[in-house]
């Protein structure tokens, strides 16, 4: 199987390429990134897809600067919405499957019943980043003829995403929603907390951490493994092995404050902290206050807890001098 990964130099893309190169089923791994794959170029997707003719494309490329998206919503829609549709249309034309990576920010976060969001729950993005990613989901579904409710429920009802959804004329499509991604490369939430904690310790100040934003910290390495497992299964069930909307996150939930305190515990940094509400933290983009996703069944089983994943990740980080 020939598998292409967009955004191959990013946090998730790096983990995907690394994982795929160790998989026997992936005969060839195509790592696509700038300048060859450019989300701002309408012809970029077709040019690559038609030339390489992959069996599956994992579309991990995105503009994930949520504040930048809020300040430039037109650019966000171009990169995270329109570009997804262009990739999906190119893949359909050559009969390639597509895995589109999406976000928990397609939900408005106003849920008050304490239940996690399921793939079949109504969406309502609270910010331009989420709106653009949701537009990308819809564009991909339109290209693949997967606009019905049965597609949204396929991953949940089939046990591991192995159920056909009544559209045999097109290849398989998976939308993988995730949340709060951390891992190398790049500065992620744990690294930002470490930097802020060291600065607070040096200056003798208190760290202020948001306590009413709840989500699912997810390790890029674990997310990549789950996506690769879905691709591995894609040849089963008559070619519909990964159809549907999948929620893929590490097990468990946390507030930003709880996540930060676990980071500080692992780093053995003792600084005073203060919980503050989101309303006091000024930023261009408003995240969903409740962004917890209910994981859908996966071929290799549920992901480990976010605490376990974070502990492993810490072994890879440079130690404080």
For the regions a protein language model found, what residue spans apply to each?
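N-terminal Rossmann NAD(P)H-binding glycine-rich loop of SDR-like oxidoreductase domains
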Residues: 3-19
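Catalytic helix-loop patch of NAD(P)-dependent Rossmann-fold dehydrogenases
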Residues: 78, 82-86, 108-155, 162-176, ...
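NAD(P)-cofactor binding segment of oxidoreductase domains
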Residues: 71-99
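NAD(P)H-binding glycine-rich loop region in Rossmannoid oxidoreductase-like domains
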Residues: 39-81
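Rossmann-fold cofactor-recognition segment
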Residues: 30-41
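Mid/C-terminal beta-alpha module of Rossmann-like enzyme folds, strongest
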Residues: 226, 233-282, 314-315, 321
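NAD(P)-dependent short-chain dehydrogenase/reductase
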Residues: 141-155, 159, 163-215, 221-222, ...
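C-terminal amphipathic/interface module of NAD(P)-dependent oxidoreductases
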Residues: 269-271, 286-321
């Amino acid at each position: 199987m020939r598998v292409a990964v967009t955004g191959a130099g990013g946090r998730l893309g790096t983990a995907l390429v690394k994982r795929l190169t160790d998989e026997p089923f992936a005969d060839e791994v195509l790592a696509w990134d700038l300048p060859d794959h450019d989300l701002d170029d309408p012809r970029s997707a077709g040019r690559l897809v038609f030339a390489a003719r992959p069996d599956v494309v994992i579309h991990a490329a995105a503009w994930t600067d949520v504040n930048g998206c809020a300040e430039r919503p037109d650019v966000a829609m171009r990169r995270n919405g329109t570009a997804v549709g262009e990739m999906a249309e190119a893949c359909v034309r050559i009969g390639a499957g597509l895995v589109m990576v999406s976000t928990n920010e397609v939900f408005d976060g106003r849920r008050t019943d304490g239940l996690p969001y399921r793939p079949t729950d109504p969406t309502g993005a609270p910010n331009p980043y989420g709106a653009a990613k949701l537009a990308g989901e819809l564009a991909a579904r339109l290209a693949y003829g997967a606009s019905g409710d049965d597609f949204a429920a396929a991953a949940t009802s089939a046990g591991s995403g192995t159920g056909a959804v009544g559209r045999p004329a097109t290849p398989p499509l998976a939308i993988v929603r995730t949340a709060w991604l951390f891992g190398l490369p790049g500065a992620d939430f744990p690294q930002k907390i470490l930097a802020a904690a060291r600065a607070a310790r040096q200056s003798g100040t208190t760290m202020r951490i948001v306590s009413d934003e709840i989500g699912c910290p997810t390790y890029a390495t674990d997310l990549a493994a789950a996506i690769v497992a879905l691709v591995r299964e894609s040849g089963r069930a008559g070619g519909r092995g990964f159809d549907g909307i999948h929620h893929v996150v590490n097990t468990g939930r946390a507030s930003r404050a709880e996540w930060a305190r676990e980071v500080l515990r692992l780093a053995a940094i003792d600084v005073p902290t203060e919980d503050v509400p989101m309303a006091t933290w000024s930023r261009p983009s408003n995240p969903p206050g409740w962004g917890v996703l209910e994981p859908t069944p996966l071929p290799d089983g549920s992901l480990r807890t976010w605490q376990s994943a974070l502990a492993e990740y810490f072994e890879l980080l440079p130690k404080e001098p």
